[in-house]
């Protein structure tokens, strides 16, 4: 018979660690579990309630999710740590699916940023922005196979029928992808082609099935676009690229799995200030120092620039920025490039979930010293997003 530690180790290695969402942890090991019950951050080996779940002959998908979402930081004893209470599974409120939405679309019916009414169309942690625990990363800028699993690739078809993956985007719920307006209308239509398809669950575009060692993801999803909605004030002829944001409604609901999850958006209750010098993360399949495009999903940590400095810099190119545009980066050969357009600019919240703060918009060449990239600030468009999405 296998020892308790071996059984737990096998379970964690195959089912838990790569796909975990961390819970918010306060000082001295206090935490809240997925049912929002206060507990202690302990080694799972010292938490009998959750250890007993793992030791069952069959662990249901719901219990696996509860275990994943129970992990915490800064615990006591041997890793991994869990927020330990007497709970063994989701409470009745968590286990019950959301009620069907009412038909009204007014912002008042949704509460702040759509958190009430309409079936809570924008998810909140732990149902968005999961953190990867996989350590299977071979190159410095490659992501883990399950990292940033809301990333989307946009596919275009030109007038000769040739297909090309160009822009990026991010899944924000099971029906919508957030991207840049310039990835939908304007020069992209003549230079790349007509936007036709969204690809989800991608890691390495050169392979049909993506594996790192013995970890393989599920097949990618190819979804059509039922409707593309560009911000009404976006003007593709305006080189300032103000309001460069768009929503893609997919032709069917996405069945979420460990490799396809939505990112969190900065709702009023979770919104944080963005400070100069703070490191944010951009991800995509854009140009690298050695190739026009990367086949493997990349990540890069970039500092936020002072907005006034950035605005003055771009004014010398007769480009005039407004407060809803973020400036990030500006380091030599460290930038979001080409194919990253429309992709997310992200950061970890206090609850350890990932939030999308920006959409890749434009820059003055790529990776040019002293020239930051410009991103559409998502928080400034939350009202528009909430008013646009529907069940």
Swiss-Prot record:
All residue ranges annotated as the Peptidase S1 domain in the record: 137-390
Subunit structure: Interacts with Spn27A.
Every Clip domain range: 30-84
Main localization of the protein described in the UniProt heading: secreted
Cell compartment(s), UniProt: Secreted
Induction: Up-regulated after wounding. Levels are higher with septic wounding, using either Gram-negative or Gram-positive bacteria.
GO molecular function: metal ion binding; serine-type endopeptidase activity
Region called Disordered, residue ranges: 91-121
Keyword Protease appears in the UniProt entry: yes
UniProt gene name: Sp7
Single GO cellular component term: extracellular space
Residues excised as propeptide: 28-136
PANTHER family (UniProt xref): TRYPTASE-RELATED (PTHR24256)
GO BP annotations, alphabetical order: defense response to Gram-positive bacterium; melanization defense response; positive regulation of melanization defense response; proteolysis
General function of this protein: Serine protease that, by cleaving and activating prophenoloxidase (PPO1) after immune challenge, plays an essential role in the melanization immune response to septic wounding. May function in diverse Hayan-dependent PPO1-activating cascades that are negatively controlled by different serpin proteins; Spn27A in the hemolymph and Spn77BA in the trachea. Important for the innate immune response to fungi. Regulation of melanization and PPO1 activation appears to be largely independent of the Toll signaling pathway.
Active-site residues annotated for this sequence: 182 (charge relay system), 244 (charge relay system), 341 (charge relay system)
Phenotype of the disrupted gene, per the record: RNAi-mediated knockdown is semi-pupal lethal, with 50% of pupae dying at the late pupal stage or during eclosion. Adults display impaired melanization at the site of septic infection (septic injury) using either Gram-negative or Gram-positive bacteria. Reduced survival, PPO1 activity and induction of the antimicrobial peptide Drs following septic injury using the fungus B.bassiana.
Signal sequence region: 1-27
Protein name: Serine protease 7
Family in the record: Belongs to the peptidase S1 family. CLIP subfamily.
Disulfide bridge partners, by residue number: 31-83, 41-72, 47-84, 128-264, 167-183, 211-216, 310-327, 337-366
Domain notes: The clip domain consists of 35-55 residues which are 'knitted' together usually by 3 conserved disulfide bonds forming a clip-like compact structure.
UniProt EC number: 3.4.21.-
Binding site for Ca(2+): 202, 204, 207, 210
């Amino acid at each position: 018979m296998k020892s308790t530690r071996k059984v737990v180790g096998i379970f964690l290695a195959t089912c838990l660690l790569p796909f975990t969402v961390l819970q918010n942890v306060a000082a001295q090991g206090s935490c809240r579990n997925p049912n929002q019950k206060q507990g202690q951050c302990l080694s799972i080996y010292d938490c009998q309630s959750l250890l007993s779940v793992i030791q069952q002959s069959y662990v249901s998908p719901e219990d696996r999710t509860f275990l994943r979402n129970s992990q915490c930081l800064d615990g006591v004893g041997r890793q991994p740590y869990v927020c330990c209470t007497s709970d063994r599974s989701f409470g009745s409120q968590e286990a019950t699916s959301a009620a069907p939405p009412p038909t009204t679309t007014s912002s008042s019916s949704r509460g702040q940023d759509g958190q009430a009414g309409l079936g809570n169309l924008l998810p909140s942690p732990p149902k968005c922005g999961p953190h990867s625990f996989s350590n299977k990363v071979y190159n410095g800028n490659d992501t883990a196979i399950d990292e940033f699993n809301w990333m989307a690739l946009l596919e275009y078809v030109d007038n000769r029928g040739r297909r090309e993956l160009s822009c990026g985007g991010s899944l924000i719920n099971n029906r919508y992808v957030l991207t840049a307006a310039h990835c939908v209308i304007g020069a992209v239509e003549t230079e790349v082609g007509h936007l036709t398809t969204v690809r989800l669950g991608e890691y390495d575009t050169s392979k049909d099935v993506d594996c790192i060692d013995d970890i393989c993801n599920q097949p990618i999803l190819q979804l059509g676009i039922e409707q593309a909605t560009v911000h009404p004030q976006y003007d593709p002829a305006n080189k300032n690229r103000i309001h460069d944001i768009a929503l893609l409604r997919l032709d069917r609901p996405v069945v979420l799995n460990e490799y396809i999850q939505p990112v969190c958006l900065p709702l009023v209750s979770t919104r944080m200030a963005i400070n100069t010098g703070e490191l944010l993360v951009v991800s995509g399949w854009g140009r690298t120092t050695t190739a026009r495009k990367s086949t493997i999903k990349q990540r890069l940590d970039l500092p936020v620039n002072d907005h006034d400095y950035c605005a003055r810099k771009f004014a010398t190119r007769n480009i005039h920025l407004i407060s809803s545009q973020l400036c990030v980066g500006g380091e030599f050969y460290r930038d979001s490039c080409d194919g990253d357009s429309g992709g997310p600019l992200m950061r970890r919240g206090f609850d350890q979930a990932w939030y999308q703060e920006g959409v890749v918009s434009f820059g003055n060449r790529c990776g040019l010293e002293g020239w930051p990239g410009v991103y559409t600030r998502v928080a400034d468009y939350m009202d528009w997003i909430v008013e646009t999405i529907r069940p």
